[in-house]
Amino acid sequence: FSDKTVSLASWICMPKYAEENRDVLVRFTRALLKAMDYAAADHQEETAALVAKQTALDQETVYEQRGDAEWLTGKQVSEGAADGTVEGYYELQKENFIAAGAVEVDPPVSDYVLLDVMKEAGEY
């Protein structure tokens, strides 16, 4: 299954906002990457409790979902942005959307994913 699809979490902003607020995007992305590292560093129960509270779910249900996917660390994401791995994930996602008829055009991933922000945010 993982060779046919990928589940990506993405945050969206308009191009004008990205141009005018790059520092905000880098700081926000850096915070997300650090949170990913924190959760991966043997803080899964604590993280599940925080997520459960924010999403109004019981902690056990949230904690059990940790095996539903391959959860990357922030460093893995930023390194993957640098070496092309993350771009490949988005390329696969785009191909699946096109095959399903959900997307009609085939733009380069770099037109809609700010890989440079991911790379810069990973410099911590």
Where on the chain are the PLM-derived regions?
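Short, structured secondary-structure boundary patches
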Residues: 1, 15-16, 81-85, 121-124
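Homeobox/homeodomain signature
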Residues: 1-3, 14, 61-62, 102-103, ...
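Short Pro/Gly-enriched coil loops immediately N-terminal to beta-strands
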Residues: 1-7, 90
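Short secondary-structure boundary/hinge segments and terminal tails
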Residues: 4-6, 69-70, 113-117
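A bilobed periplasmic-binding-protein/Venus flytrap-type ligand-binding module shared by bacterial periplasmic
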Residues: 6-23
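Secondary-structure end/capping motifs
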Residues: 19-102
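Conserved C-terminal helix/tail region of periplasmic/extracytoplasmic solute-binding proteins
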Residues: 90-124
